[in-house]
């Protein structure tokens, strides 16, 4: 009976200890500062995951201008969604410097207000411009010289950003006008000018160039 009493008292003490620890943890999680740190950690993890995905599709090369442009944009949008404070203000200042560097040095202009899905692939650099309200879906591919959201048709249209669905490919030199919607899996060919909505899975190509035969110098001399 003494042994049973000893074991019972130990179990009771253990239970009380666990209950006290659980109570402490509950109170700790209610501390605002800890909640902020947890949210910050989760936000950093999500940012990290997005950047790793972008790095993977952009040739797994951190020196690629396209990857750097996207990474800077990810940082900016992540900071914009954080609560205000001295740290946020300082990091936003760093973001603005990086944004201008990417725009001026690589020729890739992605305003902070652009919405970009996961795993965007920017092939090559220079001349890639996004409308400030553009929306880009997951797994899209955009090549050099593309303009996503050229303005025309007055103020109403100018303030409507184009929307690209998922897995859309945009060829070099293509122009997609403001307010245009591109469906999933569509392909916009090189130098195509898109002024109206494109259904999912469609292919848009510019007209084939005409071959013009000019008279040779010998033929021109004979005509004289």
What positions do the PLM features span?
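Conserved catalytic-core motifs of eukaryotic protein kinase domains, centered on the activation segment
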Residues: 152-154, 215-216
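Terminal amphipathic alpha-helical/low-complexity segments used for targeting or macromolecular assembly
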Residues: 2-11, 18-106, 217-224
């Amino acid at each position: 009976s003494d042994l049973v009493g000893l074991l019972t008292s130990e179990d009771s003490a253990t239970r009380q200890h666990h209950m006290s620890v659980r109570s402490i943890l509950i109170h700790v999680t209610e501390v605002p500062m800890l909640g902020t740190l947890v949210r910050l950690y989760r936000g950093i993890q999500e940012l990290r995951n997005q950047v790793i995905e972008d790095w993977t599709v952009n040739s797994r090369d951190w020196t690629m201008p396209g990857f750097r442009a996207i990474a800077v944009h990810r940082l900016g949008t992540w900071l914009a969604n954080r609560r205000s404070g001295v740290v946020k203000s300082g990091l936003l200042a760093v973001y603005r410097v990086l944004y201008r560097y990417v725009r001026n040095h690589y020729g890739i202009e992605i305003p902070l207000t652009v919405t970009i899905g996961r795993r965007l692939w920017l092939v090559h650099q220079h001349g890639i411009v996004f409308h400030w309200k553009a929306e880009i879906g997951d797994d899209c591919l955009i090549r050099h010289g593309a303009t996503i959201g050229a303005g025309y048709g007055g103020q109403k249209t100018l303030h409507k950003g184009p929307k690209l669905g998922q897995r859309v490919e945009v060829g070099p030199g293509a122009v997609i006008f403001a307010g245009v919607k591109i469906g999933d899996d569509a392909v916009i060919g090189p130098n195509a000018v898109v002024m109206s909505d494109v259904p999912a899975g469609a292919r848009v190509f510019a007209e084939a160039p005409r071959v013009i035969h000019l008279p040779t110098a010998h033929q021109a001399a004979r005509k004289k």
